[in-house]
């Protein structure tokens, strides 16, 4: 009988020990699970914050890119319009009445004929230039009108073609033209 009591005491002690170990294990497991949940919440929160930040950054990049594209398109359209105005001006010069062409050439020659020994002009203006100047006619040039004067030793050329005058005025006035067209 003494042995049964000892065995029973050992079994009860073992059961108590098992219960204690199990309770500690459950507590530790619960602690680990809670800690894991907290880490998961923090990680999820960090991930959401990062995703939101990345989304905001991407949104800003898309807006900036779109704004740049709009500016590029606007500038290209403005350039196209300015080029159209320039080309229309060239066409207006080409289609000037003969009397106006003569008047302009005479004005250029009156002011600058003394600076040259030879004159060049477009094929269309050749006869008119020969008529208006005593300078030697040196040949044709590719232009919409006007003349080029050259000195005796051919070291200096003065370009009074309508092409170069228009281009010079256009470049000097580009800002003003743009302001007039686009406010």
Curated annotation (Swiss-Prot):
Membrane-protein topology: Peripheral membrane protein
Q: Which domain of life is it from?
A: Archaea
Gene Ontology BP, a term: proton motive force-driven plasma membrane ATP synthesis
Q: Name one GO cellular component term.
A: plasma membrane
Name where it mostly resides.
Answer: membrane
What GO annotations for molecular function exist for this entry?
ATP binding; proton-transporting ATP synthase activity, rotational mechanism; proton-transporting ATPase activity, rotational mechanism
**Which region is the signal sequence?**
none
* Keywords from the UniProt entry: ATP synthesis, Cell membrane, Hydrogen ion transport, Ion transport, Membrane, Transport
User: What InterPro entries does UniProt report for this protein, alphabetically?
Assistant: ATPase_V1_Esu (IPR002842)
pH-activity relationship: Optimum pH is 5.2 for ATP hydrolysis.
Where would you find this protein in the cell? Cell membrane
Provide the assembly information.
Has multiple subunits, A(3), B(3), C, D, E, F, G, I and K(x); there may be a few other subunits as well.
Q: Sum up the protein's function in the record's words.
A: Component of the A-type ATP synthase that produces ATP from ADP in the presence of a proton gradient across the membrane.
Q: Which family does it belong to?
A: Belongs to the V-ATPase E subunit family.
Give the free-text miscellaneous remark of the entry. Answer: This organism has both a Na(+)-translocating F1F0 ATP synthase and this H(+)-translocating A1A0 ATP synthase.
Q: Return the protein name.
A: A-type ATP synthase subunit E
Q: Which organism is it from?
A: Methanosarcina mazei (strain ATCC BAA-159 / DSM 3647 / Goe1 / Go1 / JCM 11833 / OCM 88) (Methanosarcina frisia)
Gene (name only): atpE
């Amino acid at each position: 009988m003494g042995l049964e009591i000892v065995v029973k005491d050992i079994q009860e002690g073992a059961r108590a020990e098992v219960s204690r170990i199990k309770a500690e294990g459950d507590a530790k497991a619960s602690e680990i699970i809670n800690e894991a949940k907290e880490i998961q919440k923090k990680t999820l929160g960090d991930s959401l914050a990062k995703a939101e930040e990345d989304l905001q950054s991407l949104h800003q990049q898309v807006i900036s890119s779109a704004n740049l594209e709009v500016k590029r398109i606007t500038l290209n359209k403005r350039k196209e319009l300015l080029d159209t105005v320039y080309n229309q001006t060239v066409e207006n010069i080409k289609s000037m009445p003969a009397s106006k062409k003569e008047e302009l050439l005479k004005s250029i020659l009156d002011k600058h004929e003394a600076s040259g020994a030879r004159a060049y002009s477009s094929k269309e203006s050749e006869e008119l230039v020969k008529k208006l100047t005593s300078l030697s006619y040196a040949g044709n040039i590719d232009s919409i009108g006007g003349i080029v004067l050259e000195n005796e030793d051919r070291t200096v050329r003065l370009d009074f073609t309508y092409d170069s005058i228009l281009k010079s005025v256009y470049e000097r006035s580009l800002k003003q033209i743009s302001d007039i067209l686009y406010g």
